């Protein structure tokens, strides 16, 4: 086995272990933020939505800068620094009793993510061969789902005692992850050339096809982020207990572990990437519309199942398509910019979703936010169809397995 092949094989295992630690650290804390501050402390949902939206926008919106710096200086220092910064954000969140302190903790957490997320994504593109990326992204997403359940279960159990224990556990996991990277991650370059920060950013911004694709995905993310805000609140409201939230993530894990990899393997040779992405988005949009009209957990969990199935169809195609469009000379910059759609869509989804949720309650129209999200999903579906029409998009970009 050549040294390059050996590095790729070892790199796969490193990426999987690293991803599990990051997912556990994140999901111990973040699914419980809305429960803690809205249900336990009585804050307005929009106040928590601002905090979650700020974290999302800082982490993803500034990702191009984190990616460009990583292109210049390498992945390791950025990843280690970012993970320690996120640990500091979680520690601060544990003592937050005013909105400004929660916002500051989410700002720190998001800034840490800005530093470590783009280089971690670029490492996947660097180490995994193009024909294997779709399946590897599916494995990562299966791991994300399992980690989300374990993290949410652990966080829910700790929340019975003290929210500070929840935040301390998340902080410790990110400190462990930083030490793991500092010890084992080689000083790999992310790009084929040592791209100056400004040059990497220029390459991305001049790629109109990539920029359009990323911005179009903002509508997709407005729906996707509700698993952190409105869906947990809805489950808690109907069940009357935050303990029920863990079953929402258990559903996601079961569906992902049983369906994600088989669907990805089956569809990658039969359907174009944009068709898989659009099909998943359509299922997600349809499942959102009736949520505000349900009256029991069985109905709600059925719709959540449909939502997760849509995500299972869409996510591997979205990640694979983003990676396939990245310029090898500026991988970090491209993968950083690819998060901008999540920054915009996530921020609007959190803040707008929280505002609409409060508005729906005030007007006794609980279906209002869910109807609006469904409409946004349909508009995004049409926009993607227009962008990826045969007349506008080179065929080789969208081939099955590309």
UniProtKB/Swiss-Prot annotation:
Primary location group: membrane
GO molecular function: transmembrane transporter activity
Topology feature Periplasmic, residues: 34-98, 160-164, 235-243, 298-299, 361-367
Transmembrane stretches, start-end: 13-33, 99-116, 139-159, 165-185, 214-234, 244-264, 277-297, 300-320, 340-360, 368-388
Coiled-coil stretches: none
GO cellular component terms given for this protein: plasma membrane
InterPro entries: MFS, MFS_dom, MFS_trans_sf, MFS_Transporters, Multidrug-R_MdtH
Membrane-topology descriptor: Multi-pass membrane protein
Cell compartment(s), UniProt: Cell inner membrane
Keywords on record: Cell inner membrane, Cell membrane, Membrane, Transmembrane, Transmembrane helix, Transport
Cytoplasmic side: 1-12, 117-138, 186-213, 265-276, 321-339, 389-402
HAMAP family: MFS_MdtH
Similarity annotation: Belongs to the major facilitator superfamily. DHA1 family. MdtH (TC 2.A.1.2.21) subfamily.
Full protein name: Multidrug resistance protein MdtH
Gene this chain is encoded by: mdtH
